[in-house]
UniProtKB/Swiss-Prot annotation:
PANTHER family attached to this UniProt entry: 4-DIPHOSPHOCYTIDYL-2-C-METHYL-D-ERYTHRITOL KINASE, CHLOROPLASTIC
Biological process terms in GO annotation: isopentenyl diphosphate biosynthetic process, methylerythritol 4-phosphate pathway; terpenoid biosynthetic process
Cysteine disulfide links: none
Pathway linked to the protein: Isoprenoid biosynthesis; isopentenyl diphosphate biosynthesis via DXP pathway; isopentenyl diphosphate from 1-deoxy-D-xylulose 5-phosphate: step 3/6
Keywords: ATP-binding, Isoprene biosynthesis, Kinase, Nucleotide-binding, Transferase
Protein family (similarity comment): Belongs to the GHMP kinase family. IspE subfamily.
HAMAP family: IspE
Swiss-Prot/TrEMBL catalytic activity: 4-CDP-2-C-methyl-D-erythritol + ATP = 4-CDP-2-C-methyl-D-erythritol 2-phosphate + ADP + H(+)
NCBIfam families, per the entry: ispE (TIGR00154)
Protein name: 4-diphosphocytidyl-2-C-methyl-D-erythritol kinase
InterPro entries, sorted: GHMP_kinase_C_dom, GHMP_kinase_C_sf, GHMP_kinase_N_dom, IspE, Ribosomal_Su5_D2-typ_SF, Ribsml_uS5_D2-typ_fold_subgr
Residues that hold ATP according to the record: 99-109
UniProt keyword ATP-binding present: yes
Length: 315
């Protein structure tokens, strides 16, 4: 097989709490991550040269080493030079559907797909933990994107503990086209404003993680209780992003007032989502929010949660 086409799902955060600082400059986090059906399409194809060639179609994404998908291919070449010698370089074709700089791990999902695609293309036979270990060298969200589904993520987000399949929601997703939020800015601003409350000793952080594990959100996921899950979603970064970006705060308020079980910003934003039990309910929330907002700068998506990460679309 000389090419593989893969589906790279986006993710939403059902929970994001910042515990404190890490020695490496990142934050110690507790997150609950959930894959959704909205995703990019990535094709990896042997090209008969030694080169990585990345095509992003109509997307404004760069096609060089500033792109995570390109860096994922370079990482595989560096780690498996014999496979690169045997199979040669790769053409990567990326078709974007996940909005960029949106808090949905679009770039991370693309990188994860390249790792999985080259594992298949080069017949490496890597295990999921091996792929996740490689992914962690590129970015904090990428290990989750490999297997996807529902997971609690700790450390800087790369330590994963799979949870029972939380695939029980329809999701209304919305984002301002003109607004991008810098993830480093969001975390740095949170540190400036709330750093005095950080738990910076291991014992306190362990105790807090244990409390979250035993808390109502995780219990709701264990028992597949959509109402309980949606009632306990939480994102610390809303405290800094929403005051700094009033249109995002307004979008969140409009979505929340349109119905559904629960509304929140995903990751560092600016995407906002509402969880719904059924497709019909989600369609109603979408229609009401569109009518209330009437803003041509806002894009909406209707999607649903899924129980997997990267998948082969064809072979």
């Amino acid at each position: 097989m000389h090419s593989y086409t893969l589906h790279a799902p986006a993710k939403i955060n059902l929970f994001l709490e910042i515990l404190g600082d890490r020695p490496d400059g990142f934050h110690e986090l507790v997150m609950v991550l959930q894959s959704i059906a909205l995703g990019d399409k990535i094709t990896v194809r042997a090209n008969g040269t030694d080169d990585i060639r990345l095509s992003c179609g109509d997307s404004p994404l760069a096609n060089d080493a500033t792109n995570l998908a390109y860096r994922a291919a370079q990482l595989m070449i560096n780690n498996f030079p014999q496979a690169h010698d045997n199979y040669g370089g790769v053409d990567i074709t990326l078709t974007k559907h996940i909005p960029m700089a949106a808090g949905l791990a679009g770039g991370s999902a693309d990188a994860a797909a390249v790792l999985v695609g080259l594992d298949l293309l080069w017949n490496l036979g890597l295990t999921r933990p091996e792929l996740e270990q490689l992914a962690a060298q590129l970015g904090s969200d990428i290990p989750f994107c490999i297997g996807g589904g529902t997971a609690i993520a700790t450390g800087r987000g790369e330590i994963l503990d799979p949870l029972p399949d939380g695939n029980c929601f329809w999701v209304v997703l919305a984002k301002h086209r003109s607004i991008e939020v810098s993830t480093p800015w969001a975390y740095q601003t949170y540190r400036q404003k709330f750093g005095k409350n950080y738990l910076n000793d291991d014992q306190s952080q362990r105790a807090r993680r244990k409390t979250i594990h035993a808390g109502p959100l995780l219990q709701g996921i264990q028992h597949r209780n959509p109402g309980q899950i949606a009632s306990h979603i939480h994102n610390d970064l809303e405290k800094v992003v929403l005051p700094a970006h009033q249109p995002v705060a307004q979008l969140r308020q409009v979505l929340q007032s349109a119905g559904g079980l629960g509304t929140m910003m995903s990751g560092s934003g600016p995407s906002v989502f509402t969880l719904c039990r059924e497709q019909a309910e989600a369609e109603q929330v979408l229609a009401i929010a569109k009518e209330k907002l009437n803003d041509p700068d806002v894009d909406f998506w209707l999607t649903h949660t899924i129980g997997h990460g990267i998948q082969i679309m064809n072979n």
